[in-house]
Amino acid sequence: MASEIMTLNMGPQHPSTHGVLRLVVELDGEVIQKITPHIGYLHRGIEKLSEHRTYHQALPLTDRMDYLAPMHNNLGYVLAVEKLLGIEVPERAETIRVIMAELTRLKSHLVWIACHALDIGAMTVFIYAFREREKIMELYEMVSGARMTSNYFRVGGLSRDLPAGFESAVQEILDTFPGHFDTYEGLLTKNTIWLQRTIGNGVISADDAIDFGISGPALRGSGVDFDLRRDLPYSGYEKYDFKVPVGENCDTFDRYKVRLVEMREAVKIIDQAMKRLKPGPILADAPQVCYPPKESVYNSIEGLIHHFKIASEGFPVPEGEVYQGVENPKGELGYYMVSDGGSKPYRMRVRPPSFVNLGAIEKMAKGSMIADLVAVIGTLDIVLGEIDR
């Protein structure tokens, strides 16, 4: 019996869902034969915009890439600039960066499990996960004044110290979140419908995952034991005790399990970091780079001039090039930075994990039913703000 290939357009969806992604899917009946992603609907030119701004001015642009994990975007950027400058960040600032990065990992993974579950039809988990995410959003607002685009990290440290009440708010998260994770597992892990929609779906082998350049939970779900925090540590991650979960069956269910364990491990890292937190400075001793204290700006003409010159003219960065990767909740987020000795990046190239992971969608979904494609998109946990930049 002759078959006829049908071409189906999926999307572009509204930005409040997974993002403005369009997939052109070729089907033989309900079986996927080919998938062609169409991207660029959210392109804003962040890389090129950064090359026309000073290093401080370009920092807020990075928030707008993966807007579900803005502090990871900031962290990779400031680490790259600090590597070019050769400056060291104080221990307190480094520890706070780890705390906020792992809180951000929790926040991002909560959105993932909420939307992934909702895509497959489990609305209860969606409501619960967004309830817990709100507590981290309140911490974001407490620390930076913003709920999403935080702009909290600075080249050389942080924009401000932790506010009063932060420690108790974090402790509440440490005490309550493991129980919430148990609830999610109770609702999903042994749910017959969930198992039918995830086990054996979206399979990609370890070799194929490496060949495609997949990273993060999607890579570890395929059985590849690699995590930048452990294998190429930054921000003092080598001082923390945590395990890296890996999958065995390389499918959607394994990627789900990997992220659940990552959430539990993030809680452990935050707990260790809170115990390591000691009083001290939050900015490096580098006045040519770091803004002066507000007291100095408000009370002395020298401090005011110093602040004005850094804000308006920036600071020169030694000529050279660096690459800095960080373990974003979605995978390896990397910054390739080239300096010509001036106050603006000569070239900034971002390696976005969502973009690379999306490239494997045809490999993961070919031969599956069209209804299973939604589950594959959910398990990749992509953000189009990062893909399109």
Swiss-Prot record:
Protein name: NADH-quinone oxidoreductase subunit D
Species, as recorded: Citrifermentans bemidjiense (strain ATCC BAA-1014 / DSM 16622 / JCM 12645 / Bem)
Pfam families reported in the protein's UniProt record: Complex1_49kDa (PF00346)
E.C. code: 7.1.1.-
Major localisation: membrane
Quaternary structure and partners: NDH-1 is composed of 14 different subunits. Subunits NuoB, C, D, E, F, and G constitute the peripheral sector of the complex.
Catalyzed chemical reaction(s): a quinone + NADH + 5 H(+)(in) = a quinol + NAD(+) + 4 H(+)(out)
Keywords (A to Z) from UniProt: Cell inner membrane, Cell membrane, Membrane, NAD, Quinone, Translocase, Transport, Ubiquinone
Bilayer disposition of the protein: Peripheral membrane protein
S-S bonds: none
Domain of life assignment: Bacteria
TM spans (from-to): none
Task of the protein: NDH-1 shuttles electrons from NADH, via FMN and iron-sulfur (Fe-S) centers, to quinones in the respiratory chain. The immediate electron acceptor for the enzyme in this species is believed to be ubiquinone. Couples the redox reaction to proton translocation (for every two electrons transferred, four hydrogen ions are translocated across the cytoplasmic membrane), and thus conserves the redox energy in a proton gradient.
Translocase is among the record's keywords: yes
NCBIfam families in the cross-refs: NuoD, PRK06075.1
Enzyme class, broadest EC rank: translocase
The UniProt record lists the keyword Transport: yes
InterPro entries: NADH_Q_OxRdtase_suD, NADH_UbQ_OxRdtase_49kDa_CS, NDH1_su_D/H, NiFe-Hase_large
Gene Ontology molecular-function annotations: NAD binding; NADH:ubiquinone reductase (non-electrogenic) activity; quinone binding
Subcellular location: Cell inner membrane
Matches recorded under Gene3D superfamilies: Cytochrome-c3 Hydrogenase, chain B
Family to which this protein belongs: Belongs to the complex I 49 kDa subunit family.
GO cellular component, one term: plasma membrane
